[in-house]
Amino acid sequence: ASLCILAALLPLQSHAESSADQWQWRATVYLWLPSLGGETSFPPSGGGPSIDVSADQILDSLNFAFMGALEGRKGPWGMATDVIYLDLGSSKKATRDFGIGRIELPASVDADLRLDITGWVWTLTGSYEALSTETFSMDVLAGARMLDLQQDLRWNLNGDISALPLPGRSGSSQVEDTLWDAIVGLKGRATFGAERNWYVPYYLDVGAGDSDLTWQGIVGLGYSFSSVDVTGVWRYLDYDLGSHTPIQSINFNGPALGVTFRF
């Protein structure tokens, strides 16, 4: 398992002068199938060194996702909002894909791990059409992105753990954080084909605030019907929070398929 989304990826085509002062809207629903990576340190409830895990080594399933976007445009001005809810979780048996502080893991020790991650990504932006030709458009945008994330880890250590300064063989820990970041970026599309129904949408933003750095990139291929667009893209969203927080980094990376309704 941001903002502006697939809807924000699809800038509205130029309008006739008679409709230039009217709001034009796009609503998008889409399926995003991201893989997830990042580093998190879970402090044991009974004290001792943290349990360190890499999400990409544990997670392999998306339990539930809701994703949608809304974009409005009036003349060269636009606004967009994008919301994503992710629920990911997975278990791994007899794994050594974890760390315990800076302590070397004994050769006989492995663990059964269960990692669950739930969260919201909400992006809100305003935009201005900086460039528009028959085949290419580009908007500049600014806004904010919110990430609300909760991670739960349960573990059971196997083998001889006498050398490890932990209060017990089993445990659980939870870390959560809510981040707000200001973002700036570009979005647009390049059209091609005899009737210019095919297009390549693109989106890029970068920002900071509660996180040290966040950025998002999207690129893909779309087709416009009379009142509906169908788009397939690759989307990458990354957060770097620094080593001073339990959630040190997290990223979402994968394909998305969206359907946009224009009205």
Regions found by a protein language model. Give the residues of each.
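Predominantly the C-terminal beta-signal and adjacent terminal strand-loop region
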Residues: 217-263
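Short loop/turn motifs that connect adjacent beta-strands in outer-membrane beta-barrel proteins
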Residues: 15-23, 131-137, 192-198, 226-227
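Detector for outer-membrane/organellar transmembrane beta-barrel domains
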Residues: 169-205
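Extracellular/periplasm-exposed beta-strand and loop segments of Gram-negative cell-envelope proteins
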Residues: 35-63, 85-120, 147-179, 209, ...
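Residues that define the transmembrane beta-barrel architecture of outer-membrane proteins
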Residues: 21-23, 62-66, 118-122, 136, ...
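Transmembrane beta-strands of outer-membrane beta-barrel pores
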Residues: 31-35, 55, 74-76, 83-89, ...
